[in-house]
């Protein structure tokens, strides 16, 4: 199982990789890919795509998701993102809609958010793998322990990061973040079921750009 992760992340996470729970997690995941072939998403090389695309020190914004898309060919290791040849999912359509409304710009009709990640947006799912057609199928196998630690490491070692917490699941991570040194933005999930309960009209993206400017950070083009 080939896994790619950027060097600075290897250094930040090396102690985590040595822990018993993580070794058990790796063993479970390896077996899933071995026995279920092409039914586990994303492909092994993209499990840590969020970490491989963005060096640790370059993180400016964190957007938290729950687990990867469970349809074939969708997940690419970045939360809310899909491969460029895949139809844009409803939640991401609403994200683009809110960006266009709040920033008065036209988004690119392409669901691959690598362009955001390369500018400093850490698109982190709490659970990094999933079985086809079974959302949350890899819940409680160790991923949440790992990604909670990741959030704590970001909070402790970086300053003035914007955390966008959408929906109750993401809001539950607030206790892991030092609110005295970071900006936390909370609202409903962008899913069609809840986007009208706060997400659409939240101005999270305009607030994010303003905060980055106030702290002398290069802003992000969210097109």
Curated annotation (Swiss-Prot):
Would the keyword Aminoacyl-tRNA synthetase turn up in this protein's UniProt record? no
Q: Which reaction does it catalyse?
A: Hydrolyzes single-stranded DNA or mismatched double-stranded DNA and polynucleotides, releasing free uracil
* Location relative to the cell: Cytoplasm
User: What keywords sit in the KW lines?
Assistant: Cytoplasm, DNA damage, DNA repair, Hydrolase
Write down the EC number. 3.2.2.27
Annotated signal sequence is none
Which residues carry out catalysis?
Answer: 67 (proton acceptor)
GO-annotated biological processes:
base-excision repair, AP site formation via deaminated base removal
Q: What is its main location?
A: cytoplasm
Q: Which SMART domains match?
A: UDG, UreE_C
GO CC terms, sorted: cytoplasm
The answer to whether the entry has keyword Translocase is: no
Under the heading InterPro entries, the entry gives: UDG_fam1 (IPR002043), Ura-DNA_Glyclase_AS (IPR018085), Uracil-DNA_glycosylase-like (IPR005122), Uracil-DNA_glycosylase-like_sf (IPR036895)
An example molecular function term from Gene Ontology annotations: uracil DNA N-glycosylase activity
- Cross-referenced NCBIfam families: PRK05254.1-1 (NF003588), PRK05254.1-2 (NF003589), PRK05254.1-4 (NF003591), PRK05254.1-5 (NF003592), ung (TIGR00628)
Q: Which family does it belong to?
A: Belongs to the uracil-DNA glycosylase (UDG) superfamily. UNG family.
What's its job?
Answer: Excises uracil residues from the DNA which can arise as a result of misincorporation of dUMP residues by DNA polymerase or due to deamination of cytosine.
What's the name of the protein? Answer: Uracil-DNA glycosylase
